[in-house]
Every structure is written in structure tokens, then in C-alpha cells.
């Protein structure tokens, strides 16, 4: 999730850094200013959500509506609350139908929470593809949330948004057991992303392993292990998967009968 966190951190900066400067552009009522300041000074994620809802409820026409809903979506995603993440993502799309952050969150989180034997699996995966393709279409021209964000930084964020969309499609393809298609999507995510996420290499390795492309799978797991930003969890999984790949290669090399 390195790539996703980078994009989220940039977007979260809209609220932390951007609101005071926006107040200077358009005077707000004292009550709204105080309510928004409460969002910025909240100490815990739950306090932030409460403060955001206070603004949205009591100042329904606030010009910061989309920014605050997006912030709430990101908070709930980081908390791991899938239902609330979807709630805010859908709410954000209602307000801004082309919002790439919301499209990517819906695609990625739905793919992550879909299981092989879900009765509505294909319905969920069709939505994943729809959201991810819309994100891919919108990311290259996604407007800056703040004019003072450097062009190079925003260009990197746009690339990471495209990578996140490809990764969501890769997860959907894996759930359909279309492993070659899945691997192609993960390779696209790696190629286009400005931030290299070792978790994507892990997913690529698994797709290649499932496709019985053992040499390529081993290479992907090696790259995940070698990534400077690989977490201990990623390294542990990559090591286990490397061992699994090596055992399968050894088994495939044995002649019939195991002699």
C-alpha cells in the first residue's frame, strides 16, 4: 500500500495545509471557520470523523464539502472500516462523479474484500472493472487539489493513481482465475507508477505462480524482497513464496515416479 498512502498523504494535505489559505480567498462565517478548525485539531480518527460530520451537517453548502468527504473516506480506509470507506467513497462520487480518488478506493477496496465463493462475486468484480477503468481515464487529467502543488509532484500522483487502477483490475482478474491477464495488469501498475510498491510485486509473483510461470514468479518475489521500502510483512510473505516456488520448480524437474 506504499503507493496508495503516498497519494492519500498528498490529498490529506489539502485539508491540513490548504484550508487556511482558502479562507483568505473567501470569507467564511465564524461558526464554519471554527468547525473546520476542529477538524484540523482533532486528536484521533474518530474525533476527526465527528468533526467532519459536524461541518457537513451544519454547513451543508460549505465549499469544502468534497475535500472533507474525501478526508473522511481516507480516514476510514486507514482504519480498515470497509463499510464506512465505501459509504464516504460513494458519497464523494455523488458530489463529484469523476473523482479519481473515490473511483480508485471503491475499485481497490471492493476487490480486496471480494472472495472466490461470494455469490455476488461477478457483480462485484464488474463494478471493480468499471470504477478502475473510469479512474484510468480520469487520472491523466485529474486537476490539482491545490494550485501550489508542484507540477512534478502532481504528475507523480497521477501516475500512482493510474497504477492503483491497474492493480485493482489485476486483483479482479486473479479472482476470475485469469492469471495471465492479472499479471499483465500488475506489470502495467509497476511500469506506470511513480512510487514502486513491493506489495504489487508480491501480487504479480502470485499471479505468475498461479499461471505456473515459476521463473518469472521467483523474479517478482526477489524484487519484492529487494525493495528498499519493503515492510517486514512483505519480506516474510515474499520469502515464503520464494520457498514455495522453489519447491514447485524442484518437483517439476523430477522425472515421472520421482526418481
Language model segments and positions:
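Bacterial N-terminal signal peptides
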Residues: 9-18
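N-terminal leader/linker segments that initiate helical-solenoid repeat arrays
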Residues: 22-71, 253-254, 259
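Amphipathic alpha-helical repeat scaffolds of TPR domains
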Residues: 27-41, 63-74, 98-117, 137-147, ...
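Conserved structural position within tetratricopeptide repeats
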Residues: 57-60, 91-94, 137, 144, ...
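Short coil turns that delineate tetratricopeptide repeat
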Residues: 60-63, 97, 140, 194-195, ...
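Alpha-helical linker/edge segments of TPR/alpha-solenoid repeat scaffolds
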Residues: 78-84, 112-123, 156-175, 210-219, ...
Amino acid at each position: 500500500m506504499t503507493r496508495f498512502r503516498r497519494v492519500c498523504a498528498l490529498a490529506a494535505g489539502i485539508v491540513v495545509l490548504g484550508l487556511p489559505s482558502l479562507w483568505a480567498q473567501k470569507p467564511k462565517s465564524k461558526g464554519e471557520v471554527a468547525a473546520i478548525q476542529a477538524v484540523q485539531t482533532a486528536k484521533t480518527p474518530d474525533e476527526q470523523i465527528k468533526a467532519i460530520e459536524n461541518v457537513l451537517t451544519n454547513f451543508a453548502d460549505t465549499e469544502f464539502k468534497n475535500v472533507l468527504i474525501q478526508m473522511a473516506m481516507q480516514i476510514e480506509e486507514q482504519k480498515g472500516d470497509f463499510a464506512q470507506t465505501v459509504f464516504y467513497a460513494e458519497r464523494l462520487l455523488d458530489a463529484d462523479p469523476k473523482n479519481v480518488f473515490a473511483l480508485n478506493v471503491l475499485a481497490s477496496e471492493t476487490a480486496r474484500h471480494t472472495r472466490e465463493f461470494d455469490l455476488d462475486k461477478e457483480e462485484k468484480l464488474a463494478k471493480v472493472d468499471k470504477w478502475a477503468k473510469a479512474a484510468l481515464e480520469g487520472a491523466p487529467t485529474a486537476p490539482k487539489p491545490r494550485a501550489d502543488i508542484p507540477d512534478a509532484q502532481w504528475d507523480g500522483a497521477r501516475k500512482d493513481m493510474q497504477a492503483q487502477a491497474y492493480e485493482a483490475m489485476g486483483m479482479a482478474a486473479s479472482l476470475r482465475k485469469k492469471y495471465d491477464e492479472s499479471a499483465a495488469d500488475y506489470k502495467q501498475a509497476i511500469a506506470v507508477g511513480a512510487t514502486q510498491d513491493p506489495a504489487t510485486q508480491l501480487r504479480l509473483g502470485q499471479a505468475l505462480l498461479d499461471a505456473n510461470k515459476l521463473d518469472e514468479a521467483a523474479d517478482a518475489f526477489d524484487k519484492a524482497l529487494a525493495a528498499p521500502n519493503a515492510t517486514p510483512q512483505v519480506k516474510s510473505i515474499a520469502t515464503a513464496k520464494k520457498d514455495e516456488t522453489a519447491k514447485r520448480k524442484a518437483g517439476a524437474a523430477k522425472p515421472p515416479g520421482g526418481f
